[in-house]
């Protein structure tokens, strides 16, 4: 987890931009299919102002407005972080 803290440079994950260019991403993220294997349980907010902390995310189409740029990694062993998306806000947990 130390490397992830360095990549975030003190920013709480909240506003996320997804890129298809691995080399510009701050983090490579793998979507875990099983909740118990994930490093973090993430809830995706539908309103930007509600995305606070590490595990409450809001996706943006504007790269310059994002806190973090991520790349969806299809190989688990190449990912910096494994997440599982939960369907209820109170079930989100995890921090860097």
Please identify what each model-predicted range represents.
Residues 2-96:
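Repetitive, compositionally biased segments used for assembly/scaffolding
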